[in-house]
């Protein structure tokens, strides 16, 4: 039995975004609001602290285990970077003006060894909060896309000094038991295409590029019900601790539906058969420029 899954990525204004947020990050490092992590035994209402945007406010029930997601995702991304250091595929900056290979690009960013490159990956609680918010919104919509249930762009999911957008990567599989490592494996599946495109960021390489880009070091991930969400940014101030959210939560969102469709029957278009994947997965890859 094959498992359908979907990928989508966005480069938030790519070149213009980079200059704007780098300047902001260099001038001011402000962590997002600190919210107590409730202990959920039954369903607990949760406000992530992320801006909801316009529209009527409702909730979406989501089962979270963010401490486990934090550890698993950090381990997986660091391990991925170590593997890619050894393979040393081409990797360019977003504008193509710098880079070369994983190792040479990492060295340009100040990471001269595999340990330095892999260990540069750190958790960012503000990005985690955005990831959890976007997870709830994707589950509510029954699909992954870089917009929100109220129709606004995902870049409106802001918190603290993260006010312009992030590098957002999304994945969805009909295997609702799949965790964040499945999502990371799906994103890493773009290796051959990254090589074919000479290391450039594109619609078909953006997920893996976001995980390997040595200028992107801060990440937050969330996963539930077959959905995986990643948020990335360059080095910034903020807490490296998990929110600690673990249990069933009714997460607030704007413009949501009364009942979320099942992920197993939701794709953006029919999944092509015979993808050739050794895992038996069928692939749909979608990417967006913002």
Place the predicted regions along the sequence by residue:
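N-terminal secretory signal peptides
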Residues: 1-9, 17-37
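Composition-driven, intrinsically disordered low-complexity tracts enriched in small residues
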Residues: 36-56, 60, 245-290
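Short, well-ordered surface patches within globular domains
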Residues: 46-159, 208, 214-219, 224
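A well-ordered secondary-structure block
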Residues: 133-143, 149-261
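Residues marking the start of alpha-helices
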Residues: 3-5, 117-119, 199
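Aromatic-acidic/polar surface patches that form glycan- and anion
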Residues: 7, 66, 70, 200
């Amino acid at each position: 039995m094959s498992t359908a899954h979907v990928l989508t990525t966005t480069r938030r204004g790519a070149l213009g975004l980079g200059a704007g947020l780098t300047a902001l990050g260099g001038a001011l490092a402000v962590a997002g609001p600190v919210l107590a992590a409730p202990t959920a035994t039954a369903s607990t209402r949760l406000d992530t602290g992320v801006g909801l945007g316009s529209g009527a406010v409702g909730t979406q029930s989501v089962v979270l285990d963010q401490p486990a997601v934090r550890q698993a995702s950090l381990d997986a991304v660091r391990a991925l970077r170590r593997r890619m250091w050894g393979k040393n595929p081409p990797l360019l900056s977003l504008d193509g003006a710098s880079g070369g290979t994983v190792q040479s690009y990492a060295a340009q960013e100040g990471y001269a060894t595999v340990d330095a490159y892999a260990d540069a990956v750190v958790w960012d609680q503000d990005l985690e909060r955005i990831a959890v918010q976007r997870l709830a919104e994707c589950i509510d919509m029954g699909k992954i896309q870089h917009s929100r249930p109220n129709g606004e762009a995902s870049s409106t999911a802001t918190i603290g000094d993260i006010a312009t957008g992030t590098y957002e990567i999304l994945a969805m599989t009909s295997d609702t038991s799949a965790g964040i490592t499945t999502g990371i494996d799906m994103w890493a599946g773009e290796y051959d295409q990254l090589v074919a495109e000479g290391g450039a960021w594109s619609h078909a390489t953006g997920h893996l590029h976001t995980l390997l880009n040595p200028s992107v070091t801060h990440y937050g991930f969330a996963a539930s019900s077959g959905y995986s969400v990643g948020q990335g940014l360059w080095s910034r101030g903020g807490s490296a601790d998990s929110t600690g959210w673990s249990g069933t939560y009714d997460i607030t969102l704007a413009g949501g539906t009364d009942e979320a469709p099942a992920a197993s029957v939701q794709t953006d278009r029919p999944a092509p058969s015979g993808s050739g994947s050794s895992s038996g997965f069928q692939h749909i890859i979608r990417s967006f420029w913002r």
